[in-house]
Structure formats: C-alpha cells, structure tokens
Design a protein with these regions (language model features):
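Short glycine/proline-enriched turns and hinge-like loops at secondary-structure junctions
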Residues: 82-85, 125-127
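Conserved hydrophobic/aromatic beta-strand scaffold that supports enzyme active sites
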Residues: 61, 69-71, 90-91, 112-114, ...
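Conserved short histidine dyad/triad with adjacent acidic residue
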Residues: 50-84
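Alpha-helical bundle regulatory/interaction domains
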Residues: 2-46, 99-236, 241-243, 247-253
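Short beta-strand-initiation
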Residues: 55-57, 86, 118, 129
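Short hydrophobic/aromatic patch on the recognition helix
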Residues: 256-260
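Solvent-exposed residues in well-ordered beta-strands and their adjoining turns
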Residues: 75, 94-96, 136-137
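Short, conserved beta-strand element in jelly-roll/cupin
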Residues: 84-99
C-alpha cells in the first residue's frame, strides 16, 4: 500500500543524506511494515511484522546540515534489519526504554542505542512503539567533541550497541527531539538546531558508559531466521507448523522461539 507523504507547506523531497534543499519536517504514513521501512531517507532496511493486525507506521524526519533526525511510530511489533550509510553514527532513543532488543539483547532502562554506519543491525520492537533517531557524520561528531572537550572512547563507541546514560540528560535530548520533530515545527535556523542537538548528545555520550556485553549468537540467529523466512515463503500455499520448521532447520522449539 502506498505511503502518505506530507510536508508543512511544500512537497519537495530529499535528494541525498544530509543534503536537502529544505530544512522542514517531512512526515510519512504507511500501512505496510516493509513499505514503512523504505520511508527513512537513505537507510537500507527491511521490516517483518511479527504480531497480527493492521499495521500503521509514521515517520517524521528532519534533515540538518550534518545530521538526520527522526521520530518513528509503529503500531505493531516488528523485526527490523537496518543499515545506515557509511562514515556515520546512529543513536536511538526509545521513548519507553527497556522494551527494545538490539542484535538479540534487551537494551534495558536508561539506555542509548548505538551503531556505526555501514554495519547491519537488528531491532525487535513491541507494539505501540516510538523511537527517536539521530544520524550524524562521524567527522562532524568528532570535531564537535574535540571543541567541547568531551572525553569519548571512539574505539569503544564504534563497537557499541548499548550505552547506559544519565536519565536526566536522556530526557533532555528526548524532549529536544520531540520539540524539533513536532508536526507544526518549522526549522528557521538549521545550524542552531544542529548545535543544540549536538550539545545534548555530547552531554549524554560524555557521561555514559558503553555496555561491553555483545550477543555472540546474533549471527547464528540471523541465519536461522533467514532460513525460516525462506521456508515459509517457499510454502506460501500451506501453513507450516512449528514442529515442521524445527525439523527443517535442525533446531529445537525453544531455540526457534528464542530466535524470534
């Protein structure tokens, strides 16, 4: 089903990451999970709806000189395969922390999700979910951190999935993003907007701690999920049972359930 696209005052689309001719909030509605996945500018994504019902997704996106910011709402639980463009960092802030799985692990409370560009990652999110995202050029973030005197371990950050952060600083950044991405918001000074967001983000990174735990089983789970999808699509005219899938995949019911 086609997406419904709207801009406050114009219908001009974005041509390339972080290089739009307008600095206005772009809002898109979709009624199919995979259609919704393709609405985020210049990301490589695919979504699988994992709960029954009629899907509704909303994306509000703002392009700034060196930064992309967005709010994403999804009505049903989905599994997301995501990859942002190279030489960037993505930071994700679920509105309600503790409900998100990234690469198979529960993010937990008071956290910031992190992944570098050109690196595929997986999110599993529940129904009625809201997440705010920031994508920023790596060199711009490094330069801003140097100018502000922030002490950030970049090697750790590049391999991180989850950061434990100060709740007050996290709430401040969430509120700033919400204000900037409101339907009626007009960005009259994109450089100022970007600087405000950078300051709030650096305050979060400067006081945060990278969670060093990494899910070693993520790649295996990816392979099992991919094979299960292939089997289901190959037998679209019949409903495969869980025991049949387990037999074909050579895994236990418990292992299969964990993967999903």
């Amino acid at each position: 089903m086609a997406s419904v696209l709207s801009y406050p005052g114009d219908n001009l689309a974005f041509d390339a990451p972080l290089a739009s001719r307008m600095h206005q909030v772009r809002t898109v509605h979709a009624f199919d999970a995979d259609e919704h996945a393709h609405n985020l500018t210049d990301w490589e994504q695919s979504y699988d709806q994992i709960t029954r019902g009629h899907f509704h997704g909303t994306l509000a996106e703002l392009q700034l000189p060196q930064m992309q910011v967005f709010r994403e709402d999804t009505s049903l639980a989905v599994r997301q395969s995501c990859c942002v463009w190279p030489d960037t960092f993505w930071f994700g802030l679920p509105e309600q922390s503790g409900q998100t799985r990234i690469n198979g692990r529960l993010a937990g409370e008071q956290t910031l999700l992190v992944r570098p560009g050109n690196c595929e990652f997986e999110l599993v999110t529940p129904s009625d979910y809201v997440i705010y995202g920031i994508v920023i050029r790596r060199d711009s973030l490094l330069q801003a951190a140097e100018q502000s005197g922030s002490q950030i371990d970049w090697a750790q950050l590049a391999s991180a999935e989850v950061m434990h952060v100060d709740n007050h600083e996290r709430s401040t950044l969430l509120q700033t993003l919400a204000d900037f991405l409101h339907n009626d918001a007009v960005c009259t000074d994109p450089d100022l907007h970007q600087q405000i967001l950078l300051n709030a983000l650096l305050a979060l990174l400067d006081t945060g701690a990278v969670d060093s735990a990494v899910s070693s089983s993520f790649q295996r789970r990816q392979r099992i999920v991919a094979k299960a999808r292939e089997l289901v699509l190959a037998h679209h005219d019949q409903a495969l049972t869980v025991p049949q899938l387990c037999e074909q995949l050579f895994v236990s019911r418990r292992t299969l359930q964990y993967c999903f």
